[in-house]
């Protein structure tokens, strides 16, 4: 009997040790910055995943003009990010993650801007208002809290290496862009031979940063702020779209141009059988008028650009 008790106790003790070692290993793994970011931004991912803008992008429901404006927003965003990365390339909390040859996107985006807007593209564009807050935040972090810069770099570049490749194919197919890469240079990482291996290297470097738990928590918080900026931009997009639609109607923009058979208008064709024509306005004409508004174009651009960033997270 006593021998059985001792054996049982011995097994129990061994199990306790194994359980303790496993728990410690899990705690260490969960303390890795990459794991903390993954777990700590799940809720933000879920909110973004249900955004109609994101769903439409995946379906290829994008217009070339909006894609051009999205490229504009990306150009200003990455210009700010890479300026601050250059400023902090020797900072101990960021230096191991400084990969200008492999990751930097400004030069690629410059090529895309030239493709879409021509050689004098710099005279034609300005930083979209909707993207300005995020640009300002990046500059603030780079100049005042560089230890948090990793939140923005990791969110952007790791996503670009993942879902960005899916977005490239969607854009090329939907917009009939050249398969040789014109207009989508942003998604081409010429100096990264194996994206999966590079992402593993980047995460390992990030996890090896000498950061205490409080700083890691602040980095996760900063990553969530980036997602919040995205959500705010989508909300602004919806509000601006509604406001400008009202302005268009108040300005007396014609509901239908009166040329040809009115029944061929997709809106009227769908509503005719319902007896709902009276008092209705055609959203297709309204949408075209709204999209001609420069202010809304830039809001849509920022929304498209940040949607691309959100989508990229889904494939990491």
From Swiss-Prot:
Its EC number is 1.14.14.18. It is found in: Microsome; Endoplasmic reticulum. One of its GO terms (cellular component) is endoplasmic reticulum. Residues 1-29 are annotated as: Disordered. S-nitrosylated by BLVRB. Heme b binds at residue 45. GO terms for molecular function: heme binding; heme oxygenase (decyclizing) activity; metal ion binding. It catalyses: heme b + 3 reduced [NADPH--hemoprotein reductase] + 3 O2 = biliverdin IXalpha + CO + Fe(2+) + 3 oxidized [NADPH--hemoprotein reductase] + 3 H2O + H(+). Its main location: other. The keyword Cell membrane does not apply. SUPFAM superfamilies: Heme oxygenase-like. The modification S-nitrosocysteine is found at residues 265, 282. The modification Phosphoserine is found at residue 2. Keywords: Acetylation, Endoplasmic reticulum, Heme, Iron, Metal-binding, Microsome, Oxidoreductase, Phosphoprotein, Repeat, S-nitrosylation. HRM repeats lie at residues 264-269, 281-286. Residues 13-27 have a biased composition (Basic and acidic residues). It is an enzyme of class 1 (oxidoreductase). The modification N-acetylserine is found at residue 2. The keyword Repeat applies. Residues 1-12 have a biased composition (Acidic residues). One of its GO terms (biological process) is heme oxidation. PANTHER family: HEME OXYGENASE (PTHR10720), HEME OXYGENASE 2 (PTHR10720:SF2). Heme oxygenase cleaves the heme ring at the alpha methene bridge to form biliverdin. Biliverdin is subsequently converted to bilirubin by biliverdin reductase. Under physiological conditions, the activity of heme oxygenase is highest in the spleen, where senescent erythrocytes are sequestrated and destroyed. Heme oxygenase 2 could be implicated in the production of carbon monoxide in brain where it could act as a neurotransmitter. Belongs to the heme oxygenase family. This is Heme oxygenase 2. The lineage of its organism: Eukaryota, Metazoa, Chordata, Craniata, Vertebrata.
């Amino acid at each position: 009997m006593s021998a059985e008790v001792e054996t049982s106790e011995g097994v129990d003790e061994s199990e306790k040790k194994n359980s303790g070692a496993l728990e410690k290993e899990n705690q260490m793994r969960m303390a890795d910055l990459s794991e903390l970011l993954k777990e700590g931004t799940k809720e933000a991912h879920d909110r973004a995943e249900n955004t109609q803008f994101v769903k439409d992008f995946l379906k290829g429901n994008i217009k070339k003009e909006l894609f051009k404006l999205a490229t504009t927003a990306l150009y200003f965003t990455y210009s700010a990010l890479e300026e601050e990365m250059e400023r902090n390339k020797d900072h101990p909390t960021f230096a191991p993650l400084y990969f200008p040859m492999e990751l930097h996107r400004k030069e690629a985006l410059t090529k895309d801007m030239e493709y879409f807007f021509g050689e004098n593209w710099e005279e034609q564009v300005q930083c979209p208002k909707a993207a300005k807050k995020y640009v300002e935040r990046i500059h603030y972090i780079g100049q005042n809290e560089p230890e948090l810069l990793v939140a923005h770099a990791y969110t952007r570049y790791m996503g670009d290496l993942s879902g960005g490749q899916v977005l490239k194919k969607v854009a090329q197919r939907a917009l009939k862009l050249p398969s040789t890469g014109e207009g989508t240079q942003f998604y081409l990482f010429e100096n990264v031979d194996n994206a999966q291996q590079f992402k593993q290297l980047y995460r390992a470097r990030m996890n090896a940063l000498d950061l205490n738990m409080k700083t890691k928590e602040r980095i996760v918080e900063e990553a969530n702020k980036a997602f919040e900026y995205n959500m705010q931009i989508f909300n602004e997009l919806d509000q601006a779209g509604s406001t400008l639609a009202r302005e268009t109607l108040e300005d007396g923009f014609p509901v239908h141009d009166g040329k040809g058979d009115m029944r061929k208008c997709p809106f009227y064709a769908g509503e005719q059988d319902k007896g709902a024509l009276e008092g209705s306005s055609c959203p297709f004409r309204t949408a075209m008028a709204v999209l001609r508004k420069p202010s809304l174009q830039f809001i849509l651009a920022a929304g498209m650009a940040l949607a691309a960033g959100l989508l990229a997270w889904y494939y990491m």
